[in-house]
Amino acid sequence: MPQPFRFSVSLGGLDSADLTATAQRAEELGYSTVTLPDHLTDQAAPLLGLTAAALATTTLRVLPLVLANDYRQPVFLAKELATLDALSNGRLEVGLGAGWMTTDYEFAGVAHDSPGTRIRRLAESVSVIKPLLRGEAVSHDGEFYQVEGTLPAPLPVQEGGVPLMLAGGKQKMLTLAGAEADIIGINPGLTAGVIDERAGQDATEARTNQKLNWVKDGAGDRFDSLELQTRLHLAMISDNREEVAAEMAPLLGITAEEALGSPHALVGSVAQCIDEIKGWRDKWGISYISLDAESMQDFAPVVEALSGT
């Protein structure tokens, strides 16, 4: 049974007034969720910004997309997450990743370790955070963290627990995500620490097929219960689908045909975009679509047609 479609809007780059107004408008338009990335750029800090969005709305879910594990100790992070779930009356989704943006690490003076080390550290964080958010005792003596105890109140209030999202684009990360997460973010690989042509070339249909195989390797029998998410880096309602793709594809280091086949680009009329998203679910199981705030209004008819189906 496929997962129902839902859609999220990124609040990245918005000031405080625009952030809450955009969250309220997203809720009115039928979007499931608002998100914030986790970077030292011109944007609200993710957990504070999402708390504001949650308190300004009534049904909208909130998702940090995604928190870089290296920036926070897992027990303190679990405390923040539990509080946000309680304040939002159970509307939190937790997105975690291994961290990637070189400039963040350099600015903060945090060691930008190898991808393998960062993923091992993330795996330990997950093994600490998941039971803490369930109200369970943790006894963990690992390579990176030593934790003993239970999380004090407030605990999460969400029925069934707080959904965990892990996102990435390479084998170790997606295998871990398949084994541990409820929601899997299928991303272009960003091991270079920057978004460049290599990321575009890792966003094609062929690469997505490989990534789904890695998720399946980690998930085993639980794969069919997972929710798969994609982030749209190009989203445009247009009657000139091929022309837009031909113009944008060279910036990504791929062909127009590859751009139109990627689950990270969506260009076309409303009807074409609806058909394309349905095709992604049929082909890959992707049902959770994330886009930027500037595309929110244009894609509202797509959201209205597909949400919950």
Language-model segments: residues:
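Active-site-adjacent structural elements that line small-molecule/cofactor binding pockets in enzymes
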Residues: 1-309
